Design a protein with these regions (language model features):
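Bacterial N-terminal signal peptides that target proteins for export
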Residues: 5, 10-23
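N-proximal helix/coil linker or "cap" segments that precede and/or mark the start of modular domains
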Residues: 20-46
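A short beta-strand-turn-helix
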Residues: 40, 46-67, 93
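Active-site acidic short loop of glycosyltransferases
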Residues: 62-65, 95, 121-122, 139
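Thiol/disulfide oxidoreductase modules built on the thioredoxin-like
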Residues: 114-122, 128-172
């Protein structure tokens, strides 16, 4: 394996260097946006992203539905914990108008697809390796979620995911 020697220092593997570079790019992408759609009642920024099956995932086509948008990455532990809950919410409330959309932010879709093979999603998956959508939404960490009303306006936002968050998030979805 190739090794890189940073200035004045220890040897790092090329893989470690790549991972650090990707983390810095993602951190910069997430920190770059200062505008936030999180003002309740603000119009949610539109998105048009490639989906898991190749079809476009467009927020505009979900108008009239309650949309739970979750921003996630394959390396995010709490993201992995949130998937069974999101599967459950889609199954329980989908017939009542809920659409869960998971927006993956991995630089390589292969990383996301490996994650999805281990942790299946029974909801819509979209890919945004450039990070334009989280910038538009003012996302600073993962997982982060935004609930968008049938009128296309932001109803709620949440950062993180723990077992304790389940009840709070479900209450918001039920309203």
């Amino acid at each position: 394996m190739a090794q890189v020697r940073p200035q004045g220092g220890e040897v790092m593997s090329a893989r470690t260097t790549r991972v650090l570079r990707m983390a810095m790019v993602l951190a910069a992408a997430l920190d770059a946006g200062t505008a936030s759609a999180f003002d309740r009642g603000a119009a949610a920024p539109p998105f048009d992203l490639p989906g898991k099956d190749g079809a476009a995932v467009q927020l505009a086509k979900l108008q009239g539905r309650l949309v739970y948008v979750d921003f996630w990455a394959s390396w995010c532990g709490p993201c992995r914990q949130s998937f069974p809950w999101m599967n459950d919410m889609q199954a329980r409330y989908g017939a009542r108008g809920l659409q869960v959309v998971g927006v993956n932010l991995d630089a390589k879709s292969d990383d996301a697809r490996r994650f999805l093979a281990e942790t299946p999603a029974r909801f819509t998956i979209a890919f945004d390796p450039a990070g334009a959508t989280p910038r538009a939404y003012g996302i600073k960490g993962m997982p982060s979620s935004v609930l968008i009303g049938p009128d296309g306006k932001v109803l709620y936002e949440h950062a993180g995911f723990t077992e304790a968050d389940r009840a709070e998030l479900e209450q918001v979805i039920q309203k």
